[in-house]
Design a protein with these regions (language model features):
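Phosphate/nucleotide-binding beta-alpha loop and adjacent structural elements of enzyme active sites
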Residues: 1-179
């Protein structure tokens, strides 16, 4: 059942439109950040479209959930991709990180509000009605993760410009940009 849910989510909510932005780039060596990379679908689509156009970028993938690396094994063989088990945020510190135990990485966030949010509770209720046997669908685990600001990360890695910045961090996007 879990694979069917993943298939449906990817089929109807993930598109290859991300790669279309490449048509607007003239620069060959781009820096692409995939923050909240989960399974790396954005990066996979981007690379596929790059090959069609004869372009090659350097990718930096970020996700603080330790389970994510298991999903990225194949794309991490690509030398133009670097993965960081790190949460980008507005400070350099340790913070609590929440992830959905049913989907392992999907819906993970530094955003503590997510567990108490009315929208989340409403969505969870609908999921529970549809997938009654899977009572853990809305349970969250909590771990402590290292956070770093985007500015400090770029200084450490000697990155002057980010050409493409994709973020899917379940509500922490503004904090990342502030950092």
């Amino acid at each position: 059942m879990q694979r069917i849910i993943y298939y449906l989510l990817n089929k109807f909510f993930m598109t290859e439109a991300e790669g279309e932005i490449l048509k607007y780039f003239k620069k060959k060596d781009k820096i692409v950040f995939d923050i909240g990379c989960f399974r790396g679908n954005f990066t996979k689509n981007f690379i596929k479209n790059e090959k069609k156009l004869g372009i090659k970028s350097n990718f930096f993938l970020f996700d603080p959930n330790p389970n994510v690396k298991n999903y990225l094994k194949l794309i991490l063989e690509n030398t133009q991709i670097k993965y960081f088990n790190l949460a980008l945020d507005n400070s350099n510190s340790k913070k609590k990180f929440y992830f959905n135990t049913f989907f392992e990485a999907s819906g993970s966030s530094l955003n503590t509000v997510i567990r108490d949010d009315k929208k989340w509770k409403s969505t969870r209720k609908i999921f529970m009605q549809i997938f009654q046997p899977f009572k853990k669908i809305g349970d969250f685990a909590e771990i402590n993760v290292q956070t770093q600001t985007l500015d400090d990360f770029c200084l450490d890695e000697k990155i002057e410009n980010i050409d493409v910045l994709k973020m899917d961090t379940e509500g922490s996007e503004l904090n990342i940009l502030k950092g």
